[in-house]
């Protein structure tokens, strides 16, 4: 018997024997397909099942369901032949009440908000040019690799990155995250990024832990919560000092790039020139005024006294200007050193190679034998084949 024959037979048996089923549970994951079909996972306290509600049926549902909704479904069990995965085909849907996860989330959110853990006045600020940043996430996560890649593209090599490994899913995750936060707080960091890529409501629920929230609030180091995707909200987002919609967005929000450094230098230079011109104009007007007063005096003694005062003011002007020039010269030297440090990083980055397959970036571990790839540097690109 072929695999396709077995799957077809199993599908027929399931649809024949389980053709009219009432099913209740909570949505933990849902995808609204462009075709209009709804694909979602329904779960209870022990298990979950993949479900589908085709457009022909869901058009009669008044409200589109979302993660956390409790549903009563009616339909039948079938099997997707291509993968051999069995699923529940919903023909009718009735929303009942908030799911357990959503109810717990809202209750904890209300409790902590009343205690002031979300108070905007309690938020700690993050420096514009950080020197030391901690990242708490799983060492093996794709989110970490994306963040490190984006940091390298920022061309900002003045910041030391310290990574703290932690579980980001499951019952043991809150304690693991708390331990990592406490450890990171002992370092002299400018900020801590708490990061985790996208996942289902259940996958991200460890970031809705009360003890974790209180730990974040108690830290002396500012915390950035970068959990899931932009539509995902967890308790750590509300209690943290800054919320980033994604891990990659956290890097964009915290790390300056070469352009911002150059803009900062240009702004400082323009401010310096403007202040110098204003000082010169002010003292020149004062000198002109004193000279006019001196000319108006006919008595030699009065003229002599005014001339003495003018000499004194000129001496003061010279001292003030010298002090200002020295101050701004020191600032310009500091920025020149900063740009010189960046130049070494830019020169090294020219030798970096980017792997592409079918016009898209690809990581080395995803390549397989026979793949045709393109090796791209800043100045040129070459095609190659994996042997």
UniProtKB/Swiss-Prot annotation:
GO biological process: DNA catabolic process
Domain of life: Bacteria
Subcellular localization, as worded in the UniProt entry: Cytoplasm
Annotated GO MF terms: exodeoxyribonuclease VII activity; nucleic acid binding
Disulfide cross-links: none
Pfam families attached to this UniProt entry: Exonuc_VII_L, tRNA_anti_2
Enzyme class: hydrolase
EC numbers on record: 3.1.11.6
Catalytic activity entry: Exonucleolytic cleavage in either 5'- to 3'- or 3'- to 5'-direction to yield nucleoside 5'-phosphates
This protein's record includes keyword Nuclease: yes
InterPro entries hit by this protein: Exonuc_VII_L (IPR003753), Exonuc_VII_lsu_C (IPR020579), OB-fold_nuc-bd_dom (IPR025824)
Keyword annotations of the record: Cytoplasm, Exonuclease, Hydrolase, Nuclease
GO cellular component: cytoplasm; exodeoxyribonuclease VII complex
Role according to the record: Bidirectionally degrades single-stranded DNA into large acid-insoluble oligonucleotides, which are then degraded further into small acid-soluble oligonucleotides.
NCBIfam families: xseA
PANTHER family: EXODEOXYRIBONUCLEASE 7 LARGE SUBUNIT
Subunit relationships: Heterooligomer composed of large and small subunits.
Family per similarity comment: Belongs to the XseA family.
Protein's UniProt name: Exodeoxyribonuclease 7 large subunit
């Amino acid at each position: 018997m072929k695999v396709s024959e077995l799957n077809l037979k199993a599908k027929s048996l399931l649809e024949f024997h389980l053709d009219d089923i009432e099913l209740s549970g909570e949505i933990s994951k849902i995808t609204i397909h462009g075709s209009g079909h709804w694909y979602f996972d329904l779960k209870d306290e022990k298990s979950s099942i993949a479900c589908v509600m085709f457009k022909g049926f869901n058009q009669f549902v008044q409200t589109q369901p979302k993660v956390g909704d409790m549903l009563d479904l009616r339909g039948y069990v079938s099997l997707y032949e291509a993968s051999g995965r069995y699923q529940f085909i919903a023909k009718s849907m009735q929303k009942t009440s908030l799911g357990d996860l959503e109810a717990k989330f809202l209750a904890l959110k209300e409790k902590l908000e009343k205690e002031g853990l979300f108070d905007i006045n309690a938020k700690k600020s993050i420096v514009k040019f950080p020197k030391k940043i901690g990242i708490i996430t799983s060492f093996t996560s794709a989110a970490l690799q994306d963040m490190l890649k984006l940091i390298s593209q920022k061309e900002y090599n003045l910041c030391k990155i310290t990574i703290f490994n932690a579980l980001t899913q499951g019952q043991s995750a809150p304690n693991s995250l708390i331990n990592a936060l406490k450890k990171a707080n002992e370092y002299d960091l400018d900020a801590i990024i708490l990061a985790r890529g996208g996942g289902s409501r259940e996958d991200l629920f460890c970031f809705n832990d009360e003890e974790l929230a209180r730990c974040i609030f108690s830290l002396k180091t500012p915390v950035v919560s970068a959990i899931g995707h932009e539509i995902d909200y967890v308790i750590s987002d509300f209690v943290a000092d800054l919320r980033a919609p994604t891990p990659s967005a956290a890097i964009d929000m915290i790390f300056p790039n070469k352009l911002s450094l150059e803009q900062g230098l240009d702004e400082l230079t323009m401010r310096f020139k403007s202040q110098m011109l204003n000082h010169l104009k002010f003292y020149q007007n004062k000198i002109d005024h004193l000279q006019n007063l001196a000319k108006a005096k006919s008595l030699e003694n009065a003229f002599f006294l005014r001339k003495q005062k003018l000499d004194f003011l000129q001496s003061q002007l010279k001292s003030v200007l010298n002090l200002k020039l020295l101050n701004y010269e020191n600032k310009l030297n500091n920025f020149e050193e900063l740009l010189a440090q960046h130049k070494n990083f830019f020169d090294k980055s020219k030798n970096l190679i980017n792997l592409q397959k079918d016009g898209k970036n690809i990581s080395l571990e995803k390549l397989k034998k026979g793949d045709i790839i393109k090796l791209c540097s800043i100045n040129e690109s070459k095609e190659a084949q994996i042997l």
